Amino acid sequence: MLVLGIESSCDETGVAVYDSESGLLSHALHSQIATHRVHGGVVPELASRDHVNYLVPLVDEVLTKAQIRKNQLDGIAYTAGPGLIGALLVGSCFAKSLAYALNIPALAIHHLEAHLLAAKMETPSLDFPFIALLVSGGHCQLIEVNNIGEYRLLGDTLDDAVGEAFDKTAKLMGIPYPGGAVLANLADQCLSTPYQFPRPMTDRPGLDFSFSGLKTHALNTWNQSEKKESDRSEIAKAFQQAVVETLIIKCKRAIKESQSKRLVVAGGVGANKALRSALQKWIKDIKGEVYFPALEYCTDNGAMVAYAGCLRMMRGESDGGLGVMVKPRWPLA
């Protein structure tokens, strides 16, 4: 089965072609960082307009790379939520219209489900059940994954998502948008730090997260410093250490409570070097397994949507009718 995947939930336009027999045939991505940098964050209206401009060229690009024609496609999968409503509507309307023109099924895909399954796309031998740590700019969750569509939420953030906390902390210290990755690089390059930040919500039972207080702690530390480059790097390192250790502590609890020693890390923050290294060390110590998507599939992309769509379409699933129903807020579990 050949499935075209379309991702347009926020500020990246992703398109891919996945084959149930041969795997991922091609994918292409347009990032809108340059468009939004001048505004210091994502502007929803501009994001929607950018998707309109790039969807058709990207579809043509992936079909050419895959050496297939539109009429060879068996289905089209698209992100229907959660995300920015305008951006979601652009991708969903395009997908439904193209599917109608080609007389093939279209299927709405949950953005978070696509992230959860991204590691399985590259490692088909990854079996259910597993625990997933979903860490991105909009989410920070621990999820028990028992099968496709069978999810149980174990823990969620009570305020900021972890990627959001990275970006906001960077901005508070004068690092321009998108500053989260820059903050992480500063932390990686800093050899040591005199600062010790709190590990939020690790002193109580449960698997929920909270990062707003950590962000405030970083701001206060920055304001009390001389605001030199060395201060920025040392605060970045202390902040990242606190985030990583907090995530590790919560993952340990989740694994201990479950019957599986398989951990899947999904979402853009899954590309963080310090987090990857710490998780790999810990999971090795307990003789468990940890799976990460390749770096290019950690952030939003069309490949994960095409893959999730292919799995569901092979089970006979598809949208009913031409109606477009996107869900800006859409709980996974």
Swiss-Prot record:
Domain of life: Bacteria
Keyword Cytoplasm among UniProt keywords: yes
Enzyme class: transferase
Localization per record: Cytoplasm
UniProt keyword terms in alphabetical order: Acyltransferase, Cytoplasm, Iron, Metal-binding, Transferase, tRNA processing
Cellular component aspect of the GO annotation: cytoplasm
Gene3D superfamilies in the cross-refs: 3.30.420.40
Residue ranges that the Swiss-Prot or TrEMBL entry lists as coiled coil: none
Cofactor note: Binds 1 Fe(2+) ion per subunit.
Cofactor: Fe(2+)
Binding site for Fe cation: 111, 115, 300
Reactions catalysed: L-threonylcarbamoyladenylate + adenosine(37) in tRNA = N(6)-L-threonylcarbamoyladenosine(37) in tRNA + AMP + H(+)
GO terms under biological process: tRNA threonylcarbamoyladenosine modification
Record carries keyword Ubl conjugation: no
Binding site for substrate: 134-138, 167, 180, 272
Enzyme Commission code(s) on record: 2.3.1.234
Listed InterPro entries: ATPase_NBD, Gcp-like_dom, KAE1/TsaD, Peptidase_M22_CS, TsaD
GO MF assignments: iron ion binding; N(6)-L-threonylcarbamoyladenine synthase activity
Matches recorded under Pfam families: TsaD
Family: Belongs to the KAE1 / TsaD family.
Entry function: Required for the formation of a threonylcarbamoyl group on adenosine at position 37 (t(6)A37) in tRNAs that read codons beginning with adenine. Is involved in the transfer of the threonylcarbamoyl moiety of threonylcarbamoyl-AMP (TC-AMP) to the N6 group of A37, together with TsaE and TsaB. TsaD likely plays a direct catalytic role in this reaction.
Official protein name in the record: tRNA N6-adenosine threonylcarbamoyltransferase
